[in-house]
C-alpha cells in the first residue's frame, strides 16, 4: 500500500488522507519513506523491483527539493535527507552542513535556527551522527529508528 501513495514527483504525502505534495524531509515525505524501504526491501523479494523504482524516484525528488532551509538536522534538515541518498549525492548534501557552510547560510539568512539546537533529531547531535557514520563508512541509518 505504501508504494501506491507515492506522488508522480517521487515524494510521499506528509499525512493521510493525501493532500498537497509539499514536505521533503525525514519526518514527512520521501527521505523517511526511502530510509524505511531500504531497511525492509530484502524482506520483500517479490516487491524488489517496485521498491527499487520507488527509491529511485524518491531520490530524484530529494535531489530536486531536499536542500532545506531548516537547520541541518535529521528530522527536517539536510542531514536527514542526505542519509536517504546514494553515497555520491549524500556527500554533496553533507557539504552544505559543514560548520563553515552553516555559518555562511545563517549569516545570509538562508537557514532557520532550531528551537532545540542540542537535540538528536532536531539539532546538532543529529548532524554529528550523519557526519560520523559517513566518516566511518557505516550504513546510512537514522539513530533510534533503523540503526539496529
Each PLM stretch: what is its role?
Residues 3-24, 59-76, 99-117:
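Glycine- and aromatic-rich loop/turn segments at beta-sheet edges
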Residues 22-34:
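Cytosolic regulatory protein-protein interaction regions
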Residues 39, 43-45, 57, 61, ...:
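Terminal, non-catalytic domain-edge segments
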Amino acid at each position: 500500500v505504501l508504494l501506491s501513495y507515492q506522488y508522480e514527483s517521487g515524494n510521499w504525502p506528509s499525512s493521510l488522507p493525501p493532500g498537497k505534495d509539499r514536505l521533503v524531509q525525514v519526518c514527512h515525505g520521501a527521505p523517511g519513506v526511502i530510509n524505511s524501504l531500504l531497511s525492509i526491501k530484502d524482506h520483500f523479494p517479490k516487491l524488489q523491483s517496485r521498491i527499487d523504482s520507488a527509491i529511485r524516484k524518491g531520490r530524484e525528488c530529494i535531489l530536486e527539493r531536499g536542500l532545506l532551509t531548516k537547520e541541518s538536522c535529521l528530522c527536517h534538515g539536510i542531514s536527514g535527507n542526505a542519509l536517504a541518498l546514494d553515497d555520491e549525492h549524500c556527500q554533496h548534501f553533507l557539504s552544505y552542513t559543514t560548520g563553515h557552510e552553516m555559518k555562511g547560510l545563517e549569516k545570509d539568512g538562508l537557514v532557520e535556527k532550531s528551537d532545540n539546537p542540542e537535540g538528536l533529531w532536531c539539532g546538532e547531535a543529529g548532524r554529528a551522527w550523519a557526519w560520523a557514520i559517513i566518516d566511518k563508512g557505516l550504513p546510512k541509518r537514522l539513530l533510534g529508528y533503523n540503526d539496529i
